[in-house]
Amino acid sequence: SQAVTEQEAEALREGRTATEEELLQGLIFAGEELPCDRPSGTFYLPVDMDEEDWETGTFLAEGGGVKVYLLDNPMEDEKQEAVRTGKSYRLLAVSEDVYREYAVVFSGLPIVTLDTDTGAEIRYDEIYGTLRFYEADSKKDWVTESVMSGHIRGGSSRLNPKKSYKITLYKKNQTGSGALRKNDVSFLGMRSDNEWLLYAMYSEDTKVRDKLSLDIWNESGALEIDGEGFYGYHMEYIEVFQNGEYWGIYGLMEPVDYKQLDLTGEGEAQPVEYLYKQKDAGVFELKGSWTEQTEEDFEILEAYRAYLEGDDSDFKAEIGNLIDVDNALDVWLYLQAVI
């Protein structure tokens, strides 16, 4: 066992000096460097909550000259309970003449780390770096790494202390030129894509409502819509680290876009289908890759808005020619149930 008794730990400390300097540059498990919250000196290892037994493996210090020992033995605890309570296990790192205590926490969620090239926090302007995705249910080929760019997303939620992000994944061209191209990756059974959203769920303390509401829609209203696309999106819980700091629980989400809805776009087969996004009150933008946007592209939207603001009798007589009324009713009923 890698765990030592208190007497053995005292023997390891004897003759060495305690230090507050960074002694452990990285902690390795199953061949991968673990995420770390550097301010607290806490490393995180995602584990499979469907298995009662602890994962097998050894903690190793990255590089040479440092050895690590567990001062608390996880094997003495029930795994699911240790994860649920967020129990912290002390870890002793020793070199030839100094030592320092760290901690290990076992998580039941996948983990994403975002490390920017400059070390600056992800803000409104696009910034590049590296994303690493750690699976929880496997320790074989369990980490995916990609070049990434990211920026803060959202409307009023941008003012919250905990931000949501849009992440785009890239990989380097094999020509060796250093140029980047989009990198499609599938996470947690969701679609393979290069664009992903990290949803902060800041205003919802339980972190349950948004996920439950989304799952209800996906299993009801989204299935009632004819078409090749999927008129919903998936979200899975993860934990996020940014530049060596723990950022909390997030929702990893697919974006709602032309690919998700399987819409026709500019220059494709007729009729052209449009996806609009409301930016502010009365202000809409056309989503997708368009070389130009004309008044014609907004005619459908403006016709719908005219019916909404017009006479009730005209609305009742004509709205069925413009929208899928049954679908609109499904959406209304869904919103009454979840809001």
Where are these regions (language model features)?
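Extracellular structured ligand-interaction cores
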Residues: 111, 126-128, 162-164, 193-195, ...
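Short polybasic amphipathic segments
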Residues: 10, 24-29, 90-91, 128-135, ...
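Predominantly extracytoplasmic/ectodomain segments of secreted and cell-surface proteins
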Residues: 2-85, 95-105
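A sequence-level detector of short linear motifs
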Residues: 35, 143-144, 248
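Short loop/turn segments at secondary-structure transitions that flank enzyme active sites
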Residues: 110, 120, 171-173, 204, ...
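ATP-dependent phospho-/nucleotidyl transfer catalytic cores
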Residues: 183, 252, 258-338
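Conserved NTP-binding catalytic cores of kinases and kinase-like/nucleotidyltransferase enzymes
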Residues: 49-51, 60-65, 72, 81-86, ...
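A conserved hydrophobic secondary-structure block that centers on an alpha-helix together
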Residues: 187-248, 307-330
